[in-house]
């Protein structure tokens, strides 16, 4: 878990302000100066935003396109965990019944799925979902997603318990408890909305959670289990109260929130909170709820988030500054901030019709690197010690050799036309002519969407076209400059994310 309270008064004040919606109404300025003291104290800055990613459902991980995207993203991030739905979907074949109605288990595809992840250096967040039809109380309780997962409770809780025990025991037998104990087992997905058909919804989910957690822990107490994996930061106090009062095991809290969710739904307020602040405000709310509970030690896994989906923003350079905002404001709040998703190998609405449809991933259909792919690559270079700064559009970090890695960005005000702005870094504590290097993603740099449009926006790009787009948009070599009397002047284009290295 994060040592949450060790962070600076500045950061705690920021978190509190976000939780109450106080940080609103900021406007980008045409000119901005950022004061940096390289000798200032630092605080740990774990890379919580790039260590866990979501993806399309379990069976898709057997596709080579999925694995290609996983390997590509892992090359430019600290990708450690992947979370997907539907490991118990009938297409995975885990649960069946013989002619006498007796349970029959089959873990063949489960093994292929998890073997493939581990072979590529990524571990699973085992989201335990959805209900096998032959175990379902209502076999016809199908979700409208394209793959029609069953959202019913089990017809027999005893059979569910047995399935959970067999599932966990198989994983321990195959991979060893030392490995499985590093995984996270998350019970269901967003049970507060239409992914769960139990009645009453909350109480029936809590019962499912209790049975699942006890069954998993019955196989080995080192297995880590948590929830409630709710949409819109819901149910957390009730979940923690239930688990504490009923002595139900829980090793972590998980929930979801997206930047474009309604403020009332996400935060329970009518405050005017800009989209880019909403996810971390919700996470801060949940963190405070955990701290106020009987289980304040629990880590928080934010297992789904993304930038707004309107206007196909997820395919554009906008993701960079929005991502950087989330990294800055969620620092110290969540143990993981899991971007949904790393790949557009994703079929909730059916197979993709063409690349760049505004899907969630960092790579478009066919293995095309989106601008967001390069945004994550830039932020990966940040150090693991952070220097506090008073502006909202910069992150200052320090490396072991004393050099600085600084991210600055130009996030447009909501509803306003994005414009370029001038930024001056005034840096103390380094030689006044120190060498710097600069890389960026913006409308003109590493913008694969524009490269795709230059090719005529083909619905089915040929492999050579994909290779061409990725080659043309790869991060450019750093621009080398020097400080001028301790200062560096930059012009940030609209939707720019810029990484500056100061020092060796």
Regions found by a protein language model. Give the residues of each.
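Active-site-proximal loop/turn and secondary-structure-junction residues that shape catalytic pockets
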Residues: 88, 130-132, 189-193, 229-233, ...
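Short, conserved phosphate-binding/catalytic loop or strand-edge motifs used
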Residues: 183-190, 303
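Noncatalytic carbohydrate-binding groove/subsite architecture in carbohydrate-active enzymes
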Residues: 201-335
């Amino acid at each position: 878990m994060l040592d949450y309270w060790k962070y600076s008064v500045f950061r705690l004040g920021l978190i509190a302000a976000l939780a109450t919606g106080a940080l609103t109404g900021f406007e980008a300025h045409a000119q901005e100066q950022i004061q940096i003291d390289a000798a200032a104290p630092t605080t740990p800055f774990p890379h919580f935003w790039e260590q866990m990613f979501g993806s399309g459902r379990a069976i898709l991980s057997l596709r080579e396109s999925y694995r290609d995207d996983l390997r590509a993203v892992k090359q430019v991030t600290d990708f450690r965990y992947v979370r997907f739905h539907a490991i118990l979907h009938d297409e995975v074949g885990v649960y069946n019944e013989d002619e006498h109605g007796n349970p029959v288990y089959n873990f063949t595809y489960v093994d292929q799925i998890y073997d493939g992840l581990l072979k590529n250096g990524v571990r699973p967040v085992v989201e335990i979902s959805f209900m096998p039809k032959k175990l379902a109380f209502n076999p016809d309780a199908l979700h409208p997603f394209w793959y029609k997962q069953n959202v019913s409770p089990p017809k027999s809780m005893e059979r569910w318990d047995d399935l959970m025990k067999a599932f966990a025991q198989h994983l321990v037998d195959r991979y060893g408890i030392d490995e499985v104990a590093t995984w996270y087992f998350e019970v269901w997905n967003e049970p507060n909305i239409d992914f769960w058909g139990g009645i009453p919804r909350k109480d029936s989910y809590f019962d499912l959670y209790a049975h699942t957690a006890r069954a998993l822990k019955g196989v080995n107490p080192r297995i880590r289990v948590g929830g409630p994996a709710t949409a819109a930061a819901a149910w957390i106090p009730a979940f923690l109260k239930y688990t504490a009062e009923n002595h139900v095991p829980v090793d972590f809290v998980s929930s979801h929130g997206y930047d474009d969710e309604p403020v009332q739904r996400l935060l329970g307020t009518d405050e005017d909170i800009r989209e880019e602040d909403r996810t971390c405000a919700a996470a801060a709310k949940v963190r405070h709820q955990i701290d106020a509970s009987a289980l304040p030690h629990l880590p928080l896994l934010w297992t789904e988030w993304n930038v707004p989906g309107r206007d196909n923003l997820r395919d554009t350079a906008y993701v960079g500054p929005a991502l950087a905002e989330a990294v800055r404001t969620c620092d110290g709040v969540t143990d993981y901030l899991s971007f949904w998703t790393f790949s557009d190998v994703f079929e909730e609405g059916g197979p993709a019709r063409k690349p760049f449809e505004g899907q969630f991933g960092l790579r478009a259909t066919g293995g095309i690197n989106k601008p967001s792919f390069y945004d994550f690559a830039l932020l990966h270079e940040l150090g693991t010690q952070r220097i506090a700064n008073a502006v909202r559009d910069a992150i200052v970090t320090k490396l072991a050799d004393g050099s600085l890695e600084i991210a600055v960005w130009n996030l447009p005000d909501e509803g306003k036309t994005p414009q370029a702005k001038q930024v001056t870094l005034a840096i103390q504590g380094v030689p006044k002519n120190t060498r710097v290097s600069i890389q960026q993603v913006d409308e003109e740099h590493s913008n694969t969407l524009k490269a795709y449009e230059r090719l005529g926006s083909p619905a089915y790009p040929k492999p050579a076209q994909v290779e061409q787009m990725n080659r043309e948009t790869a991060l450019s070599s750093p621009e080398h400059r020097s400080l001028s009397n301790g200062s560096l002047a930059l012009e940030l284009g609209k939707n720019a994310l810029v990484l500056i290295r100061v020092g060796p």
